[in-house]
Amino acid sequence: MRSGFLQKWRIIMKWQEIPTPCYVVDEKKLKQNLKILQNLEQETGCHVLLAQKAFSMFSLYPLIGQYISGTTASGIFEARLGKEKMGKENHVFAPAYKEKDMEELVQICDHIIFNSFAQYEKYQHYFLQQECTASAGIRVNPECSTQEGHEIYDPCGPGSRLGVVKSEFPDQLPEYRIGI
């Protein structure tokens, strides 16, 4: 089933006639790649999520949504985009959240990842409400760098503030609804 948007704007052109700069998507190749991801989901039971930060061509979300489980966002605006344009699983992670955004995030997201236990505790009252269906998780910093010479950009490097390192984990995890 073709997206209405894609069908409406489907244009056949010679490559040499395409005005530049522009974004051109080869729908056949995209579908081939999406079928690989769909097979991965079927074979493993995992959920493949579109990282909107890497690819936010939302006109293709209906097509992409036919093959994968949903989207992942880095904040309120991407979370809204994923909810509105794909309408499937919607996950969000941000190093920090604003109080005014959390009320909407728990309504439009299925899973919200926090950067620390303190951050989760600040917002846990949203997850304890009976009507809340979103789940929460903690970002783990595995402290396992895979690169050398770029420590400043390494989210797992020494001094990174992204995620909880082993030494910051309590002996016993808190008894509220949270995942890792």
Language-model regions: role of each:
Residues 12-24:
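Generic N-terminal amphipathic, Lys/Arg-enriched alpha-helix
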Residues 46-180:
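Active-site-proximal beta-alpha core segment in soluble small-molecule metabolic enzymes
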Residues 33-43, 81:
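A short, N-terminal amphipathic alpha-helix
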Residues 19, 44-45:
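Eukaryotic alpha-helical scaffold "rod" segments
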